[in-house]
Curated annotation (Swiss-Prot):
The keyword Metal-binding does not apply. Residues 87-193, 227-248, 260-307 are annotated as: Disordered. The keyword Phosphoprotein applies. Signal peptide: none annotated. The modification Phosphoserine is found at S101, S129, S134, S256, S269, S278, S344. InterPro entries: CH_dom, CH_dom_sf, F-actin_Monoox_Mical. This is Smoothelin-like protein 2. Belongs to the smoothelin family. Residues 351-458 form the Calponin-homology (CH) domain. The modification Phosphothreonine is found at T96, T274. Residues 55-88 form a coiled coil. It comes from Homo sapiens (Human). The lineage of its organism: Eukaryota, Metazoa, Chordata, Craniata, Vertebrata. Residues 94-107, 272-285 have a biased composition (Pro residues). SMART domains: CH (SM00033).
Length: 461
């Protein structure tokens, strides 16, 4: 008897389901194996990461403990310092938290603005009447300025006062207290416009005591300063004794002019020695004053021409006149005193002044195209250096990048006009003169105008 078709079909279905179930179980087992393998890999990597992070965690914990220990020690030291300060009666240290800074004493003047203004004045011009032409003169002597309140500062023709600190060390030691201030005659540098250094004249550096005394009289000093001597400044003549003729004197001419002459004697004699007066000229005062004014006017006109060499020639002629006048009335056997240049005029060499001014121009034109300052002649021939110097102080006045070295006349006209309008710097050089001089203009003309630019542009720094 054969089975029914329904029973056979049901058995076939059950066999198919069994095979399908076995396949599913195999797939699930394979999936479980893969999951266990992945879990083992993750656990292995986590363990490796934990092993690597373990020393770092221990190091961080050690650092935290050290930080806490140091903070505790710092607090303990702070309390000890405060206890010591209270025990010794000292006030708390200014600047600590909770401690206000003490206000400045009302009786102590603030010297910072004056020092700053004096330092600015020292950088303003290169003046022959100054004590030095170095740009760093005031920075080097700032400590001396704070210690000596009556030191004589002569920068750019400005002289705030006079004191014993301005003379040599031998004279300064004999002053126990500063003299009361009294009005001083205005020096020639204040009465006349600024005249830049153009040349340095070598002169004899040895003068005898009597020679200098006869030449540098109060009347001649006042004449050089452009003023008549006041009755309060009349000084009694001094006649050296035979024992003093062989003594060594050091004459110092202050920077305010050729007026006041002092001397220091290397012995126990009085510190200040006044040379005798020269005989007063019988010329009437009115005629003398008119003659002096005419000479000053001619000197002013001569100083405004280019190149400026009148000052050096005038100084050389002055010394030659002194030597001629004193050689006629004095013997050759008298002792001669050494005139120290550092104490007489304080004039640096012309090359050093030019180098300082050239370095200043380089610092202001650094980074500008077509500008390579090597001298005061060819480096300024195309006008680009003048434009760069003015543009460094007034960057909004014109577009420097639009200029070209080939347009020389345009560059000169632009630089000179902007300097005159913005910095009030007069034209000491004309555009036509620069065009005529070509690629190698006169160094003295260029130096004179650049120095004038320096004097006016420094005010805008």
């Amino acid at each position: 008897m054969e089975p029914a078709p329904d029973a056979q079909e049901a058995r076939t279905v059950r066999e198919a389901l069994g095979r399908y179930e076995a396949a599913l179980e195999g797939a699930v087992r394979a999936l479980h194996e893969d999951m266990r393998g992945l879990q083992r890999g993750v656990e292995r990597r986590v363990a490796e990461a934990m092993r690597l992070a373990g020393p770092l965690a221990r190091t961080v914990a050690d650092l935290q403990r050290d930080n806490q220990r140091l903070q505790a020690q710092l607090e303990r030291l702070t309390r000890q310092v405060e206890a010591l300060g209270l025990a010794s009666g000292m006030s708390p240290v200014p600047g600590t938290p909770g401690t206000p800074s003490p206000p400045p004493a009302p009786g102590v003047p603030d010297r910072a603005p004056r020092l700053g203004s004096a330092r600015f004045a020292s950088h303003a011009t290169f003046s022959l009447s100054g004590r030095g032409q170095s740009l760093d003169h005031d920075e080097a002597s700032e400590s001396e300025m704070r210690k000596t309140s009556n030191s004589c500062i002569m920068e750019n023709g400005h002289q705030p006062g006079a004191g014993p600190g301005d003379g040599p060390p031998e004279i300064a030691q004999n002053f126990s207290a500063p003299d009361p201030p009294r009005p001083r005659p205005v020096s020639l540098s204040l009465r006349l416009p600024h005249q830049p250094v153009t040349a340095i004249t070598r002169v004899s550096d040895r003068f005898s005591g009597e020679t200098s005394a006869a030449a540098l009289s109060p009347m001649s000093a006042a004449t050089l300063g452009g003023l008549n001597p006041s009755p309060s400044e009349v000084i009694t003549p001094w006649t050296p004794s035979p024992s003093e003729k062989n003594s060594s004197f050091t004459w110092s001419v202050p920077s305010s002019g050729y007026g006041a002459v002092t001397a220091s004697k290397h012995s126990n004699s009085p510190p200040l020695v006044t040379p005798p007066q020269s005989p007063v000229s019988p010329q009437p005062p009115a005629i003398t004053q008119v003659h002096r004014q005419g000479e000053r006017r001619r000197e002013l006109v001569r100083s405004q021409t280019l190149p400026r060499t009148s000052e050096a020639q005038a100084r050389k002629a002055l010394f030659e006149k002194w030597e001629q006048e004193t050689a006629a009335g004095k013997g050759k056997g008298e002792a001669r005193a050494r005139l120290k240049r550092s104490q007489s005029f304080g004039v640096a060499s012309a090359s050093s002044i030019k180098q300082i001014l050239l370095e200043w121009c380089r610092s202001k034109t650094l980074g500008y195209q077509h500008v390579d300052l090597q001298n005061f002649s060819s480096s300024w021939s195309d006008g680009m250096a003048f434009c760069a110097l003015v543009h460094s102080f007034f960057p909004d006045a014109f577009d420097y990048n639009s200029l070209s070295p080939t347009q020389r006349q345009k560059n000169f006209e632009l630089a000179f006009t902007m300097a005159e309008n913005l910095a009030n710097c007069e034209r000491l050089i004309e555009v036509e003169d620069m065009m005529v001089m070509g690629r190698k203009p006169d160094p003295m003309c260029v130096f004179t105008y650049v120095q004038s630019l320096y004097n006016h542009l420094r005010r805008f720094e």
